[in-house]
UniProtKB/Swiss-Prot annotation:
Biological role: Binds to poly-U elements and AU-rich elements (AREs) in the 3'-UTR of target mRNAs. Required for the vegetal localization of vg1 mRNA. Probably required for nervous system development.
GO biological process, one term: negative regulation of DNA-templated transcription
Family: Belongs to the RRM elav family.
Lineage, broadest ranks: Eukaryota, Metazoa, Chordata, Craniata, Vertebrata
Official protein name in the record: ELAV-like protein 2
């Protein structure tokens, strides 16, 4: 490891790599690791890494020997920087930073790099796996070809002790199989654990065994049993076509198929994965102690509910994005984007009505401070001080 890190650090100091914005940071990280010794390969004794284990064994297909998955990338790292970093090892055929489609291109913290030469892919794993960038320790391994045995192996875990660390969460679940990724959700303002986490296993059968063994059990430090279940049941995924059709009928009450609990937590996971580091910014329209306003009516809708004010929307924002963001938290009865009379462009704010207070409060807690494109949304219950439609 030390020799390879030295080689890469030397390469980065020379030639075209020296001008890259990330070069200094990578070199510093490599030099720190060289002075501290080899990167830890044992998760139990390595608190700063997440599943920092030996590379995944290679599959038999030729493509799998060149295609790598890179996890735990810094949130602000671009695809160009990812390509430059791995391009320092060898010639790359393709590189892709995975982005959130709903949030207009925000990085999800992982990507894929496909080399021309399998030897370069192997060298990249041996050289860059476990490298610490900013607050992240990146994990580099062979990407697995898609198959039924590895799909839907992501678990949602609730009821965790607020004091449980990510390392302890992995230790609890590691007895059932190889863990690919893990995460504990934290409050965006206080940083305190929300008692909810996610574990992704290498194979679905491992996830099934974890459910059998841990669902309803009390882990160390817990006062209540934890809930363990699949987080991404395909039958609970958002059907955007149906969602759009529902919106086309303004007098039809939204039945809330997106309110299923698993889907709600799945979106919550995505939001926290992508934007957990952003501090929430509260609406300039004062929130009067999470005041509820029952009986709010929008033009064309006579229902009652809890009205939510959404501020700092982009000029091209439309109602469908509000459906997509708020639907997973519960039953939505109406959405409205306020538009300029002359241009028909969004004036920067809109309203969402939800039938259940707890679901509305959860949506506010999760989406206030949420970055949509280049804008940070401000979400609160509608008050008398809020803009009027």
């Amino acid at each position: 490891m030390a020799v390879r890190l030295c080689d890469v650090a030397s390469l980065l100091r020379s030639g075209s790599w020296a001008a890259e914005p990330w070069t200094g940071q990578v070199i510093a990280a490599m030099e720190t690791q060289l002075s501290n010794g080899p990167t830890c390969n044992n998760t139990a004794n390595c608190p700063n890494t997440i599943n920092c284990s030996s590379p995944v064994e290679s599959n038999n297909t030729e493509d799998s020997k060149t295609n790598l998955i890179v996890n735990y990338l810094p949130q602000n790292m671009t695809q160009e920087e990812l390509k430059s970093l791995f391009g320092s090892i060898g010639e790359i055929e393709s590189c892709k930073l995975v982005r959130d489609k709903i949030t207009e291109g925000q990085s999800l913290g992982y990507g894929f790099v496909n080399y021309i030469d399998p030897k370069d892919a192997e060298k990249a794993i041996n050289t860059l796996n476990g490298l610490r960038l900013q607050t992240k320790t990146i994990k580099v391994s062979y990407a697995r070809p898609s198959s039924a045995s590895i799909r839907d192996a992501n678990l949602y875990v609730s009821g965790l002790p607020k004091t449980m660390t990510q390392k302890e969460l992995e230790q609890l679940f590691s007895q059932y199989g190889r863990i690919i990724t893990s995460r504990i959700l934290v409050d965006q303002v206080t940083g305190v654990s929300r008692g909810v986490g996610f574990i992704r296993f290498d194979k679905r059968i491992e996830a099934e065994e974890a459910i059998k063994g841990l669902n309803g059990q009390k882990p160390p430090g817990a006062t209540e049993p934890i809930t363990v279940k699949f987080a991404n049941n395909p039958s609970q995924k958002v059907n955007h076509t149906i969602l759009s059709q529902l919106y086309q009928s303004p007098n039809r009450r939204y039945p809330g198929p997106l309110a299923q609990q698993a889907q709600r937590f799945r979106l919550d996971n995505l939001l926290n994965m992508a934007y957990g580091g952003i501090k929430s910014r509260f609406s300039p329209m004062a929130i009067d102690g999470m005041t509820s306003l029952a009986g709010i009516n929008f033009p064309g809708h006579a229902g009652t509910g809890w009205c939510i004010f959404v501020y700092n929307l982009a000029p091209d924002a439309d109602e469908s994005i509000l459906w997509q963001m708020f639907g997973p938290f519960g039953a939505v009865t109406n959405v409205k984007v306020i538009r300029d009379f002359n241009t028909n462009k969004c004036k920067g704010f809109g309203f969402v009505t939800m039938t259940n207070y707890d679901e509305a409060a959860m949506a506010i807690a999760s989406l206030n401070g949420y970055r949509l494109g280049d804008r940070v949304l401000q979400v609160s219950f509608k008050t008398s001080k809020t803009h009027k439609a």
